[in-house]
Swiss-Prot record:
The gene is flvcr2a. Residues 445-470 are annotated as: Disordered. It catalyses: choline(out) = choline(in); ethanolamine(in) = ethanolamine(out); heme b(in) = heme b(out). It comes from Danio rerio. Residues 1-23, 95-96, 153-157, 219-254, 319-320, 377-384, 436-470 are cytoplasmic. Choline uniporter that specifically mediates choline uptake at the blood-brain-barrier. Responsible for the majority of choline uptake across the blood-brain-barrier from the circulation into the brain. Choline, a nutrient critical for brain development, is a precursor of phosphatidylcholine, as well as betaine. Also mediates transport of ethanolamine. Choline and ethanolamine transport is not coupled with proton transport and is exclusively driven by the choline gradient across the plasma membrane. Also acts as a heme b transporter. Residues 49-66, 117-123, 184-188, 286-289, 344-346, 411-412 are extracellular. This is Choline/ethanolamine transporter flvcr2a. Belongs to the major facilitator superfamily. Feline leukemia virus subgroup C receptor (TC 2.A.1.28.1) family.
């Protein structure tokens, strides 16, 4: 049982945190290289999540399996995440960013080469094995944007850096919507179809191999000097306070975080369901439009990329975490309603437009959830809070994909989309009840205030953060 004391995290700096250590915060130019590398292997992995689902009918024909079986090539990403996130988060706590990055890039690379060997109609199980390997790599990736941002970037950059980290994943999904319908056209000759699939798999494997080599030789654990006062406080924290199980227990007693955990899962789970079933929804109303289904998916994600970056910059400037998160959540609900009631009107241009509106807010919500969670749970590890958020998203994603798929089969796409609208409304209401306890901001202000009293004569003046070469 949780008492009131358990739900409180003291964010005051340790008594031995001297001004000299606080004033040594620095920003390294290499932080942008690290962020680019992370975004690159995240992109490669996310591309593979959706590469089957967006041409669902083509892979059904090639492997001679049901649409539900092809759906599982996407849902395996969600299923794998749930049991493996806890050991992976523990590994992140013990071994750090570099080990996790190496495992992510290497397992993802291995999965791509397994799929290269699966281009025969009788080898569906091999392509599932390769996809399973890639789904394991995803566990090392999905919760990392906020961790990379906090470890490498200053307090005025973390939200933007987190948004850029999420951007890599979103861009991978966007390419996954766009490229497979172009590389793998719906041809009748099975030999020709196998050749097209093989080309797609070989290109993916080559890119994954190059990224893996870059991670091996370039990716670093952390900067020598911390980039922010909050990171200084964490580095000065006694190691006993970094217990993973104790951290999980404290998070489970944090009521604002629990509300965010559920509402985040409802929103992102809805996005996973829409993305996985997009081909089926578009083809039902617009037969033969596989390529345009991919382009609609691209529109959905690109609009979300823009939304993510705008929201990240907005958070860095305003620090209005709850207000922004609630506004974007409500607009995601509105966007889903508009998409639901315009999908069957027979105008593809309208579907492109409504998908863009939906994507701008629904995908734009992703970095908001990460950063709001970090604020609510500081000084707990960013990887732990992000991992739990993503675990919630996977659970709801699997449930929503299966249930919405069955509803579409029996009652049509409108009923399936209304099903998601109901849960987005519930998530919006839950978000409104989250208490805005911005602990990381308090830590930066209080630590900075202590330093100001010793080295700055003017109230509110902050310590300079130096940017140095790589």
């Amino acid at each position: 049982m949780c008492d009131k004391a358990d739900n409180h995290i003291d964010v005051q700096p340790e008594g031995n945190l001297e001004v000299s250590s606080v004033s040594s915060t620095r920003l390294y130019r290499r932080r942008w290289v690290i962020l680019l590398l992370f975004s690159s292997y995240s992109l490669c992995n996310a591309f593979q999540w959706i590469q089957y689902g967006i041409i669902n009918n083509i892979f059904m024909k090639f492997y001679q399996v049901s649409s539900f079986a092809v759906d599982w090539l996407s849902m395996v990403y969600m299923l794998t995440y749930i049991p493996f996130i806890f050991p992976v988060t523990w590994l992140l706590e013990r071994k750090g960013l570099r080990v996790v990055a190496l495992l992510a890039a290497s397992i993802n690379c291995a999965g791509t080469w397994i799929k290269v060997a699966s281009v025969q109609p009788s080898l569906f199980w091999v392509t599932m094995l390769g996809q399973f390997a890639c789904s394991c790599a995803q566990v090392f990736i999905l919760g990392m944007p906020s961790q990379v941002a906090s470890v490498w970037f200053g307090s005025d950059e973390v939200s933007t850096a987190c948004a850029i980290g999420v951007f890599g994943n979103q861009l991978g999904i966007a390419i996954g919507f766009l490229v497979p319908p172009v590389l793998v056209p719906n041809v009748e000759d099975m030999g020709e179809l196998a050749e097209h699939i093989s080309i797609m798999f070989y290109i993916t494997a080559a890119v994954a191999t190059l990224i893996f080599l870059l991670v091996v030789f370039v990716f670093q654990e952390k900067p020598e000097t911390p980039p922010s006062l909050a990171q200084v406080a964490l580095r000065n924290m006694p190691t006993g306070q970094h217990s993973y199980l104790a951290s999980i227990a404290r998070l489970m007693c944090n009521k604002p975080f629990i509300l965010l955990l559920i509402s985040y899962g409802l929103n992102v789970g809805s996005f996973y369901a829409v993305s996985t079933l997009l081909n089926r929804m578009i083809i039902e109303h617009y037969p033969g439009e596989e390529v345009n289904a991919g382009r609609i998916g691209l529109t959905l994600v690109v609009a979300g990329v823009v939304g993510s970056l705008i929201c990240g910059v907005w958070l860095d400037k305003t620090k209005t975490y709850k207000q922004t998160t609630l506004s974007v959540y409500l607009l995601s609900f509105v966007g889903m309603l508009i998409y639901s009631f315009t999908l069957n009107l027979g105008h593809l241009w309208l579907v492109f437009l409504t998908s863009g509106v939906l994507g701008f807010f629904m995908t734009g919500y992703l970095p908001l959830g990460f950063e709001f969670a970090v604020e609510l749970t500081y000084p707990e590890s960013e990887g732990t809070s992000s991992g739990l958020l993503n675990c919630s998203a996977q659970v709801f994603g699997i449930a929503f994909t299966i249930i919405q798929g069955k509803i579409i089969d029996h009652f049509g796409t409108l009923a399936g989309n209304i099903f998601l609208c109901v849960f987005l409304l519930i998530g919006s209401i839950m978000t409104a009840f989250i208490k805005s306890d911005l602990r990381r901001q308090k830590a930066n202000q209080e630590t900075g205030g202590n330093a100001d009293s010793s080295v700055h004569p003017q109230h509110g003046e902050t310590l300079p953060v130096k940017e140095v070469k790589m």
